[in-house]
């Protein structure tokens, strides 16, 4: 029943030209003593290990087979599930996105691992960048931290000769795109 509802929502997103986003991999409210004391969602969560790949692939395939697979961003919490690479069809650049590191992974190491995995299996240049937890005002500074981490990562690649220094104009444009324009264009704001 849950998957049928998700399919209907996915089709509705496709009809509206919207993007569907899935955050998965968390085990919530694990410390019962603190849960009783402070309530839900107060920082006592863990990275989970779930077998979501088959179910997610079937879900996306069903939408794709019906011609109604909308733009999709997948955010995983467990870094062992970083690699994603199905259902690109050329209609939208980066149609299926590997979302930015979040929760336990929205720190330097987690962000770098996510961007490196994306670079290996996709196009970093099409990445829509950092997300914001709009429920928390304090989450907004992570965009600045993300941009600095992105620039350091790409700068190291240039210093190591992995990106030719003669391509700096393209590199600069890629940084601007990841920091702003890709999201603007992807979400059609």
Across the structure, where does each feature detected by a protein language model lie?
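Active-site beta-loop-alpha junctions enriched in small/polar residues
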Residues: 25-29, 77-79, 101-105, 135
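C-terminal catalytic subdomain
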Residues: 91, 105, 109, 137
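Mid-to-C-terminal alpha-helical segments outside catalytic/metal-binding sites
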Residues: 124-125, 142-189
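Catalytic grooves of carbohydrate-active enzymes
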Residues: 134-135, 139-143
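Histidine/acidic residue-rich metal-binding segments in metalloenzymes
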Residues: 1-71, 81-95, 113-129, 147-150, ...
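A generic structural motif
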Residues: 96-106, 129-131, 160-172
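Divalent metal-coordination and catalytic microenvironments
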Residues: 23, 133, 183
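Alpha-helix capping and helix-loop boundary segments enriched in small/acidic/polar residues
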Residues: 46-50, 141, 170
